[in-house]
């Protein structure tokens, strides 16, 4: 294992700091990590880096700006690639450029391996697998964003501003923009219905929620990833013509509408003058972010309801992260575990044939045990309203079903 960055001096300083924090300062082996110096402006350095590894995990962003040289180097050297981006333009570009040839080589590029969109993508997969176990086909999945604590990074803000400044951004807003074209034998991909701003969904009462949902700012990112999962050939029989919706859980319709109004106002201001807000210090700059205390004490709790085609039964999933800020500490841990799963189990994974993949389409439930080491767990339950005790080991059972 090795850490890579542009600056050898900063890499050395990082190694020393991590050794101190983990009580390994002065140990002959230190952290046990090597270091590599590579720069996106130097393609030869990127290829040399990619040539040394089976799986490269990229945290460089905005990916629309810096990601393509890394992807090109990995493609050329045969390395698998994982990233944490939610940038649809970059994801679409690498799909169009690499997907078909990656499938011929059995090489995997797995995108969205962070908070967006591992919890949502895997929860959707586990829910539709549970419906399949019940003998039901899925009609719709609704993800309810619950209690969470975390901050926002300067890099995330920079990616958002970079996207807003892109005159081509409107080409990448459709929910199915990342979906695989498939073949004529597959189910049709119908246009997702326009979701209301505030809506009610049954099934959340199982988790103590009243079922009122308002807007979720990351639905546009997560929906594209999930629709790509649903569209890939080995996933289409399971997902069918699935509809995905996402919202933030609220105690009442009134609170959901109040939050929707506040979010709409904030989005309008950000859309109008993002660069001014950044200069005024309203947001962290690239390289800045939450305090260590917030990174260490953050968490998330989300719930998902998957309805059967006849709307008579449903499966629910509670996905939670308990070991840190979702967008920082937990994202880093999830991405590392995804990369580890790919490195250790590639040949037995659902996505072993390669391509530009999502977490669910590449790993299936095989990554669930890896994510548990990052403090991210999935509680799968089944039944109708008021039914459904916890299904012990449901996620593990799904993993075995996938492998079988």
Named regions from a protein language model:
Residues 1-10:
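Conserved glycine-rich Rossmann-like NAD(P)H-binding loop of the short-chain dehydrogenase/reductase
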